[in-house]
Structures are given as C-alpha cells and as structure tokens.
Amino acid sequence: MKNLTDSFVYLGHWPSAGSFGFNTDILATNPINLSVVFGVLIFFGKGVLNDLLDNRKQRILNTIRNSEELREGAIQQLENARARLRKVETEADQFRVNGYSEIEREKLNLINSTYKTLKQLENYKNETILFEQQRTINQVRERVFQQALQGAIGTLNSCLSNELHLRTINANIGMFGTMKEITD
C-alpha cells in the first residue's frame, strides 16, 4: 500500500525552483496533482461512503415503511370512520325529527378529526423523510471531508523525510536571521 501511495506521490511531485507550499489558485494547479488527490480520495473513501450510504438508505427505507404502516392504519381508521358515518346517517334518518342538527355536527366533527389525524401523519412522514435525508447528507459530507483530510495528511507524512525537515528548518532560520539584520 505504501509503494502504491509513493508511486502516486512521485507522479505528482515535480522539483520546484521556487518554494514549497500549497497552490491555492485552482486554475494554475497541475492536473496531475488534482488527479492524484481525486484518485486517493476515491480509493480510500469509496468503501466507507458505500457503507454509510447503505446504512442511511436502510434507515430511510425503514422510516418510509413505518410511515406507510401508519398511513395504512390511518386509512383503516378512515374506513372505520366512514362505516360509522354510514351508521350515523341511517340513525339520522330515523331520528331526523328529534335532532338532525346534532347528528350533522357529530358527523362533521368526526370527518374533521379524521382529516386532521391523516394530515398530521402525512406531515410527520414528510418531516421524518426530510430530516433523515438532511442528516444523511451532512454525515456523508463530514465523512468525505475526514477521509480527504486523513488521506492528505498521510500523503504529506509519507513524502516528508528528516533531511527535508532539516533543510526547511535551516532555510527558515536563515530567513529569520536576514529579517533580524534588516530590522536592526
């Protein structure tokens, strides 16, 4: 694995006449360096990302199944309410003389309460799906960022040797000495 990483590092490493640092200008960045970074990100992040997406998919599907079961229960309640409504309507025909307005109120209350229950269940299902999608997207973003950061740190650590560290330290000490002479 280290040899594979080293080969990518050597492909993307060109000796520079200037200084060592990150190039933040994306248009001036070497396409080989970009392809190496993307290759490392894809290679290391693919398995973790697939597992994470599969887990999220299962959770979302379970939530949808639960919501569908709740919906079916609400539909069953609606069927029961309709049966009850038919029963109330036949009783209303029998008792029309005594209390037609009271029966109408009960019917409307029953329909309104059933409608509100269905609406609440539908809203809950939609909110749950949206929440799970947002949470999944955020976790995937976080995981990809962590993988990219770990890959970049690993690549940097494998590229830097003790000799390069010493040369960098000596060059910085020399620059600070020159700056001190200029300010004195």
Curated annotation (Swiss-Prot):
Gene expressing this chain: atpF
GO molecular function, one term: proton-transporting ATP synthase activity, rotational mechanism
Record localization: Plastid, Chloroplast thylakoid membrane
Protein family per UniProt: Belongs to the ATPase B chain family.
Name of protein: ATP synthase subunit b, chloroplastic
Gene Ontology CC annotations of this record: chloroplast thylakoid membrane; proton-transporting ATP synthase complex
Function: F(1)F(0) ATP synthase produces ATP from ADP in the presence of a proton or sodium gradient. F-type ATPases consist of two structural domains, F(1) containing the extramembraneous catalytic core and F(0) containing the membrane proton channel, linked together by a central stalk and a peripheral stalk. During catalysis, ATP synthesis in the catalytic domain of F(1) is coupled via a rotary mechanism of the central stalk subunits to proton translocation.
Tagged with keyword Cell inner membrane: no
Domain of life of the source: Eukaryota
Further remarks about this protein from its record: In plastids the F-type ATPase is also known as CF(1)CF(0).
Taxonomic lineage from the root: Eukaryota, Viridiplantae, Streptophyta, Embryophyta, Tracheophyta
Assembly description: F-type ATPases have 2 components, F(1) - the catalytic core - and F(0) - the membrane proton channel. F(1) has five subunits: alpha(3), beta(3), gamma(1), delta(1), epsilon(1). F(0) has four main subunits: a(1), b(1), b'(1) and c(10-14). The alpha and beta chains form an alternating ring which encloses part of the gamma chain. F(1) is attached to F(0) by a central stalk formed by the gamma and epsilon chains, while a peripheral stalk is formed by the delta, b and b' chains.
Membrane topology: Single-pass membrane protein
Keyword terms: ATP synthesis, CF(0), Chloroplast, Hydrogen ion transport, Ion transport, Membrane, Plastid, Thylakoid, Transmembrane, Transmembrane helix, Transport
Principal cellular location given in the protein's record: plastid
